[in-house]
């Protein structure tokens, strides 16, 4: 028996689409029917001026463009898989007063020259234009040699709620910056606001849409379950589909569209059921998108 591959359209992604291997029927597992909603909202909105920085929290080069700075010259830190020094980013949601390790590691076969490394955390201040405010943490370590993965230093996440800029820099003996990595983290959860719906029913094909109205990115696959309302009970409809295994990261303020076939469905009330992960919240949410076949 042939299995149809799900068609997909990509809209508003922030650049991370991880292609895995093979196909799967991807069962969603046990679903708590009482927890199914078409829209989920959590948290309070941060200042709108922070949104571009939150969206690019894991993207050093995009942050550099926002700040008008130069990053990842390849002089010392890994860039485009050059054999240099690897690093971990301090990005996304971090709990207040938690301790975070700043790690470095040798990448490839090169032996980077020992250098001075500076770690800086400063608060971003909102306004018409976001600006870099007070320096909260600054640590300088001389003569850093990198071999295996090791903890360069540890930092404590500030208690004051806000959005913060993290800098990891290599320096010359005179203090000139030769290479720089930037990221953004925040110790208050950005607003989560997701809506799931079915639209554009042509009689043979419809489109499910995930709207990210919030301020934090979410991740999901293209798999879903289809259910039909029958005698007061939602019953799963078997799907003759092979879902391609991919992970999609959807930025705040964007939407994702995916077409699916409805030509073989009898008249009645249906819903799509789909699970979305919200990494900043450390939770998964199962959403429903009702629709009618007339």
Name each region found by the language model:
Residues 19-22:
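C-terminal motif of bacterial Sec signal peptides marking the signal peptidase cleavage site
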Residues 128-141:
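A surface-exposed loop-and-adjacent beta-strand signature within N-terminal beta-sandwich domains
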Residues 139-163, 240-269, 277-279:
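Short, solvent-exposed, Trp/other aromatic-anchored flexible loops in extracytoplasmic proteins
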Residues 26-130, 154-235, 240-241, 250, ...:
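Primarily secretory-pathway and cell-envelope proteins
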Residues 233, 270-271:
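Surface-exposed, secretory/extracytoplasmic low-complexity segments enriched in Ser/Thr/Asn/Gly/Pro
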Residues 2-11:
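Bacterial N-terminal signal peptides that target proteins for export
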């Amino acid at each position: 028996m042939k299995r149809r591959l799900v068609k997909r359209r990509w809209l508003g992604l922030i650049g991370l689409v991880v292609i895995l291997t093979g196909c799967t029927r991807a069962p969603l597992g046990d679903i708590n029917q009482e927890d199914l909603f078409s829209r989920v909202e959590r948290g309070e909105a941060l200042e709108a001026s922070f949104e571009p920085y939150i969206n690019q929290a894991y993207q050093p080069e995009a942050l550099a463009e926002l700040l008008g700075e130069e990053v990842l010259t390849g002089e010392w830190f890994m860039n485009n898989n050059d054999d240099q020094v690897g690093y971990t980013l301090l990005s996304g949601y971090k709990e207040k007063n938690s301790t975070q390790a700043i790690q470095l590691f040798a990448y490839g076969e090169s032996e980077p020259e020992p250098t001075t490394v500076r770690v800086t955390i400063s608060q971003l201040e909102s306004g018409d234009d976001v600006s870099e405010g007070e320096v909260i943490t600054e640590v300088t370590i001389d003569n850093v040699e990198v071999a295996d993965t090791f903890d360069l230093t540890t930092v404590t996440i500030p208690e004051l709620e806000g959005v913060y800029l993290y800098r990891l820099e290599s320096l010359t003996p005179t203090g000139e910056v030769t290479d720089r990595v930037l990221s953004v983290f925040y110790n208050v959860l950005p607003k989560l606001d997701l809506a799931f719906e079915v639209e554009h029913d042509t009689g043979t094909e419809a489109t499910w849409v995930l709207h990210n109205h919030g301020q934090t990115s979410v991740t999901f696959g293209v798999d879903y379950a289809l259910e039909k309302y029958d005698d007061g009970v939602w019953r799963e409809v078997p799907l003759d589909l092979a879902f391609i295994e991919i992970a999609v990261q959807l930025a705040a303020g964007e939407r994702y569209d995916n077409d699916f076939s409805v030509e073989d469905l009898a008249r009645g009330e249906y819903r799509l059921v789909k699970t979305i992960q919200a990494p900043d919240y450390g939770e998964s949410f199962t959403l429903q998108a009702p629709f009618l076949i007339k």
